[in-house]
Amino acid sequence: MESTLRSGGTTVEEVVLNLLSVNYNELVMAASGEAAEKALADTNAKEHILVVNGSIPLKDGGIYCTIGGKSAEQVLRESAENATMILAVGACAVFGSVQAAKPNPTGAVGVDEIIKDKQVINVSGCPPIGEVITASLAYILTHGKAPELDSEGRPLFAYGQRIHDSCPRRPHFDAGQYVRTFDDAGAREGWCLYDVGCKGPSTFSPCPILQWNLKAGWPIGAGHPCIGCTERDFYDRFTPFYQKLPTVPGFGVEATAEKIGLGLTGVVAAGVAVHAGVTAARAAADRKATKNSPMAAFGDAPTDSPSPSSTGQATEQNSEAK
């Protein structure tokens, strides 16, 4: 919601008051208490589009998040029953985000780990970009169906390309010009942040194009490396945040950044064009075809997760990764 409030184009006031019928949202609705719960129940009884924000904790019967005496899992199942479309908005709703990081003490999971019988559109990011949220809703309302999705359920129009492929600092990567420390000359000149931990080569997101706060800025533009927050289990796979990724895809093989950048001497212009085109094409194709496509990372995603019950009451299961 915070990100949506600061989106550009159509204002959130126009969206909420004139374009959409937002029957239940704790942050913008006037009702509270029993009146709010009645609004939710009335909406759940008929067809609707469900937008979910936040992870769902399953351990210990779901006691770590309760609303109106019901666990978050119960509320989700009831709300999803008559939903014609479901959007999981934000990294928490998509895969659990930081709450789901090992050892995941609350058993936090994303929406699509609970709702298996309906399509879930995953609008990932921490936070997600407001324009991607509103564009996804606009597409659904206009076409009556979900936009084309990648293998992880994310809209391809937004998540079809890596940050690395459209980053304004990409020419410095190709030229082998890297920030080595945050106070060096390269940092002042706006060089590539790969050496100080940027996860842009492994992260699919439109951040460089849309940015945040009416295009006022974004992390890399402010001099901070991308942490990969749109990618599943990023906190387990991409930490330490300020450590360089082991490898990045280049010229069809895994090559270090130094080999890609410094090895282009004499053929820079042609090589850069080929590298950018090939990696962009491979990125879109790989993400479209394969869930959890192999990308440079420090570790694997957690292997164990809590199991939601068929009755809406979470089972108690150790969610710590093996």
Where on the chain are the PLM-derived regions?
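Short Cys/His-rich local motifs and their 1-3 flanking residues in nucleic-acid-associated proteins
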Residues: E231
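Short, membrane-exposed interhelical loops at transmembrane-helix boundaries
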Residues: P208-A216, Y242-V253
